[in-house]
Amino acid sequence: MNVSAIIVEYNPMHNGHLYHIKKTKELTNCDALVCIMSGNFVQRGFPSILDKWTKANMAISNGVDLVIELPTLYSLSSAEFFSFGAVSTLDSLNIINSICFGSEIGNINALQDIATTLLEEPLEYKILLKNYLDKGISFAKARNLALVELNRDNKIMSENINKILSLSNNILGIEYLKSLLLLNSSIKPFTITREGADYKDENLHKEYSSASSIRKYLKENKNINILKDFLPLEGFLEFKRLITKGYNFSMEDSMINYIRYKYISGYKNLHNLIDVSEGLDNRIYKSLEKNFTYDSLVGEIKSKRYAYSRIGRILCQYFIGFENYDLNSLLKSTPNYMRVLASNEAGLKVLKKIKKHSSTNIYTKVPKNTNTLLNLDIKATNAYSLLNNNIRFNEDYFRSPIIIKNTIY
């Protein structure tokens, strides 16, 4: 059985994601497609616009065979740890033959070369990186500049590196490849050229629009018929239903109110979060005293050194309560379980194969004794339930995987 995998967030699922599913199947010729998906919080530093079960259901309805949850610890981490959490989980299953991701360059060899350099970290690269970081430049930009300078004698390579590392999906793809190399994984990587608008583009475009533009439109408009051209049918109908129910499409703004209350109640322990360097905690506290929306708060805090998404992840972590955990130890470990969110009949066959070939614990229901990673997922859902009225407190304990039978693609 040839099993391929994709790493996704679906915030929300749109036509570009359908293209990714279709091209993955064509490129890998797989018999089954597994996706590991961020749950109720996503890597850009937002609460997910739809809950994880609704997203999983849409994925199965649109060509995925098995959906498993990426632990919240990883979904709210940097690209490096996000990728490692996803890839190490997939690798531990011992049945995944390939992984396919979208990138702007669409060239797996170019991405592999950069990934190898970043993993091996030659001394000159380390020195260059430190010099740029000492100037107050963000890690991502400092890394780009160091790599360009490392290849300064090769003009073509230097120009290509700068172009590759300026685009978000290339960067994430490199992190996937680094994780595969680090794990000495047998999973074969593939990439497809990403179609459509950049994820930061907030304008709707014909056929392929970014998730950001769709979220923005949902926040600002009640008539969503225009979105029918950009979403799978299930997604369009779900959003149409939610609008009639007065759904909260601005959950990040609601989250800020809870965060402000936590701060004024005396919980000043942001410094325990690993992404919070010295002084950043006080910068956030001061901003919380005068900003009432997510965009205004993050906009005031962000700087050359502190990227928008990094601040967003810190706020989500603080909202959930990450500061009470030993995050350094957790991030250095590999997940020892997989949480099933949804499946079809082909996915059930994949699960049987996993049980036969892997020692990874498969959870279809929350066990009595939860490990720390799973406990964080439960806390994340409980925090999310404060923002999304469709989700109950302790929803993780009530939900079983969604099983859809007789889906054919």
UniProtKB/Swiss-Prot annotation:
Subcellular location per the Swiss-Prot or TrEMBL entry: Cytoplasm
KW Cytoplasm (keyword) present: yes
GO cellular component: cytoplasm
Record-listed E.C. numbers: 6.3.4.-
Disulfide bonds: none
Gene Ontology MF annotations: ATP binding; ligase activity, forming carbon-nitrogen bonds; tRNA binding
Catalytic reaction(s) noted: cytidine(34) in elongator tRNA(Met) + acetate + ATP = N(4)-acetylcytidine(34) in elongator tRNA(Met) + AMP + diphosphate
Keyword terms: ATP-binding, Cytoplasm, Ligase, Nucleotide-binding, RNA-binding, tRNA processing, tRNA-binding
Keyword match S-adenosyl-L-methionine: no
NCBIfam families attached to this UniProt entry: PRK13670.1
Record-stated family: Belongs to the TmcAL family.
Main function: Catalyzes the formation of N(4)-acetylcytidine (ac(4)C) at the wobble position of elongator tRNA(Met), using acetate and ATP as substrates. First activates an acetate ion to form acetyladenylate (Ac-AMP) and then transfers the acetyl group to tRNA to form ac(4)C34.
Protein's UniProt name: tRNA(Met) cytidine acetate ligase
Organism encoding this protein: Clostridium botulinum (strain 657 / Type Ba4)
Gene: tmcAL
